[in-house]
Amino acid sequence: MAEQLTEEQIAEFKEAFALFDKDGDGTITTKELGTVMRSLGQNPTEAELQDMINEVDADGNGTIDFPEFLSLMARKMKEQDSEEELIEAFKVFDRDGNGLISAAELRHVMTNLGEKLTDDEVDEMIREADIDGDGHINYEEFVRMMVSK
């Protein structure tokens, strides 16, 4: 996954890694991670810090080296990309920009995609995604529907 990063991104992440790696030994410990987190206004417990490290500690040595850090950053960026893609997709459906997808908006987009749906089929799609029962699909409902596919 780290292969998808540009040289510029890798250089930026190397700088960030150096900020975490206080003693310059090439690894980030829970202590170093805690120091940086606290400087950013967070107050994680020792267990939370260990969990964060364990999440990316591929070789299981209890610390994060630069390749592990790059892997974490690449994963976070990929999550960010898919979030942006969902927002863009939602905007396509939400034609009037009111933050809700109505049956008419859904029907219009589906028709433009070549899907000829009956009113009942469109209503059924809305009902399936419409968790709060207001007759429209809001962004959270849209995300839940897209992610559960």
Curated annotation (Swiss-Prot):
GO molecular function, one term: enzyme regulator activity
Annotated Ca(2+) 4 binding sites: D130, D132, D134, H136, E141
GO cellular component term of the entry, any: cytoplasm
Domain EF-hand: 8-43, 44-79, 81-116, 117-149
Residues carrying N6,N6,N6-trimethyllysine: K116
Reported modifications of this chain: The pantophobiac mutant CAM2 is undermethylated on Lys-116.
Keywords: Acetylation, Calcium, Metal-binding, Methylation, Repeat
Residues where N6,N6-dimethyllysine is found: K14
Annotated family: Belongs to the calmodulin family.
Name this polypeptide is given: Calmodulin
Native species: Paramecium tetraurelia
